[in-house]
Amino acid sequence: TLSPTWGIYSGYELCENTPLREGSEEYLDSEKYQLKPRDWATAAREGTTIAPLVTRLNTIRRAHPALHRLRNLRFHHTDNDALIAYSKREGSDVVLVVVNLDPHRTQEATISLDMPQLGLDRHESVPVHDELTGRTYQWGRTNYVRLEPGRAPAHVFHVRRPSAAAPQNGGAGVS
């Protein structure tokens, strides 16, 4: 969601990441070096594929005009360098993303939003709907986040305008 265009190498969906050699950024199983048959069905059955997540992210990207542009990217402060927070806004469509950059450990942080960048008043509170989980939270200028790799590595929030529906979970929530 950071960039409007992206792609992945075949096999990445199966989390293949063995380097070609020590310290190399190139992958051993890259189609650059070989053709490798992959067992997609077994990976799906065993839960060792991120293909459903990639599919969901692509669906979210198609649904939100804010994610179709590059120059509308704005970063928001986190008090933990292992988490990144950014937003994209196009007209009334506002998407806020928080990602755990640590693939091994759960990370927590307070996210401080630049409310005017979201088209909101500094002290406003709005419902944010997580497009990955379906949950809705009430967020204001500062918000607590806890993200676990393998379970909830990110939030992709659709920021609901003040006239939008109230949160489904009854108010502020810990993510």
What is the predicted role of each segment?
Residues 2-3, 8, 12-175:
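Carbohydrate-interacting/catalytic domains
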